[in-house]
From Swiss-Prot:
Residues 417-451 are annotated as: Disordered. Its EC number is 2.3.2.-. It comes from the Bacteria. The lineage of its organism: Bacteria, Bacillati, Actinomycetota, Actinomycetes, Mycobacteriales. It comes from Mycobacterium tuberculosis (strain ATCC 25618 / H37Rv). Substrate binds at residues 323, 337-338, 362. This is L,D-transpeptidase 5.
Length: 451
């Protein structure tokens, strides 16, 4: 069946831009709709469709890669341990390098998607670093990676050192000592960078002792003696750390040591005897002579001393007591105020019955050698029954002469709510009295204490 549609000539509908509707026109509404259905008014319809096609055909170009530098480009006074990286958005890195002013490439690593490049080693002080490389966008076009920054120039760098050797085996009372070569104004920042890990875990804490002539010092000790066999690891992240007043740490340090057998010396002044005690019990019990105590400088100090040195031969001097360069055998130093446990045949008649020394603990030559061969750095020597307490005035290690609450109050970090107020201990070590024995660091000098 053929359907014929007849059209009468019609006039085009003029465009009416006014808001008034047209009530009548050359064709009826029905006819207009019929005409639209058969494409009579196609030119108008095509114009509208063409507009949509044009919009679909318009494609925005992909965004160019965006670079983010950390620290920002041209930054100055950057701390050399700060996180250093460059990140690209809307792209990925082809290659990236950071070089110092001497042209050395700094170690770094890409993220898995190659959108982040992170520096993996510390930087140097007072150095300009330059970024180079390229990143590729989604359009395949490369853009350069270019930037620079400068690290801080310290007013000075501060060095530090441990008193123990790495891998050393020590006694159950050995503290960890870090000696700095300069005073430190921001001790809290330094203390936060120090960690001690023990196996098995033991409770312990840092304390800042009075500064010595060479600089600040901080000690760590356990609350109680270490269990025998404990391993200790110390990590000091000091490089790049601000110490205050424009000073920075010179290097990181680490230390591993272990605690040996448990050995304690029991030294009761009024008994005129000395005992060496291990887990096996009393292994030595010797007659001895302690400080005469006629003068304060001749009093063997009360409290827990720590073995720090020992010499098979040692030359002692004590001008205040009237002698110098006296050869003694089997000398074990227990404090830096001149106290030793050593052989002294001259006091043999008093050993076991009276105290006649200048403060040292005298033994017979045979007994002194036997004790000497058993002693190691860090062994505690517990002196009781004396009239003067071991204190900060007596040298470098008096860590066990204070109670635990006093010890933790000497930390530079903010105290917990229950922590006691800081004990009033001098900021700097006291001046050695003129009549005190002269400490000695070597066994063959004339600058040794006598006793």
């Amino acid at each position: 069946m053929v359907i014929r549609v007849l059209f009468r000539p019609v006039s085009l509908i003029p465009v009416n831009n006014s808001s008034t509707p047209q009530s009548q026109g050359p064709i009826s509404r029905r006819l207009a709709l019929t005409a639209l259905g058969f494409g009579v008014l196609a030119p108008n319809v095509l114009v509208a469709c063409a507009g949509k096609v044009t919009k679909l055909a318009e494609k925005r170009p992909p965004p160019a890669p965006r670079l983010t530098f950390r620290p920002a480009d041209s930054a100055a006074d950057v701390v050399p341990i700060a996180p250093i990286s460059v990140e690209v958005g809307d792209g990925w890195f082809q290659r990236v390098a950071l070089t110092n002013s001497a042209g050395k490439v700094v170690a770094g690593a890409y993220s898995r998607d190659r959108t982040i490049y992170t520096i993996t080693e510390p930087l140097g002080y007072d150095t300009t670093y330059t970024w180079s490389g390229s990143a590729v966008g989604h359009d395949g076009k490369a853009v350069p990676v270019a930037g620079k920054f400068t690290t801080v120039a310290p007013v000075k760098t501060i060095n530090a050192g441990f008193q123990l050797a790495d891998g050393q085996t020590v006694g159950i009372a050995a503290p960890v000592i870090i000696q700095f070569d300069s005073p430190i104004s921001d001790k809290a920042a330094v203390e936060r960078a120090l960690t001690v890990t023990t196996d098995p875990p033991v409770e312990g804490g840092w304390a800042w002792l009075p500064d010595e002539a060479q600089g600040a010092r901080v000690h760590w000790r356990p609350r109680e003696y270490y269990p025998a066999g404990t391993t200790v690891d110390v990590d000091a992240k000091l490089y790049g750390l601000p110490f205050g007043d424009g000073a920075y740490g010179a290097q990181d340090m680490s230390l591993h040591f272990q605690i040996g057998r448990r050995q304690v010396v029991k030294a009761e002044v009024s008994s005129h005897r000395i005992q060496v005690v291990t887990d096996a019990g009393v292994i030595m019990d010797f007659p001895c002579s302690y400080g005469e105590a006629d003068l304060a400088r001749n009093v063997t100090r009360n409290g827990i001393h720590v073995v720090t040195e020992k010499y098979s031969d040692f030359y002692m001097s004590n001008p205040a007591a009237g002698y110098s360069h006296i050869h003694e055998r089997w000398a074990v130093r227990i404090s830096n105020n001149g106290e030793f446990i050593h052989a002294n045949p001259m006091s043999a008649g008093a050993q076991g019955n009276s105290n006649v020394t200048n403060g040292c603990i005298n033994l017979s030559t045979e007994n002194a050698e036997q004790y000497y061969r058993s002693a190691v750095y860090g062994d505690p020597v517990e002196v009781t029954g004396s009239s003067i307490q071991l204190s900060y005035a007596d040298g470098d290690i008096w860590d066990w002469a204070v109670d635990w609450d006093t010890w933790v109050s000497m930390s530079a970090l903010p105290p917990p709510a229950a922590k006691p107020a800081a004990t009033q201990i001098p900021v700097t070590a006291p001046v050695t009295p003129s009549d005190a024995p002269t400490p000695s660091g070597t066994p063959t000098t004339t600058n040794g204490p006598g006793g």
